């Protein structure tokens, strides 16, 4: 999910 990509 997006929080893993930041």
Curated annotation (Swiss-Prot):
Alphabetical keyword list: Amphibian defense peptide, Secreted
Compartments, record wording: Secreted
GO cellular component, one term: extracellular region
BP terms from Gene Ontology: defense response
Main location: secreted
Coiled coil: none
Tissue expression notes: Expressed by the skin glands.
Known function: Putative defense peptide.
UniProt similarity note: Belongs to the frog skin active peptide (FSAP) family. Tryptophillin subfamily.
Official protein name in the record: Tryptophyllin-3
Organism, scientific name: Ascaphus truei
């Amino acid at each position: 999910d997006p929080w893993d990509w930041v």
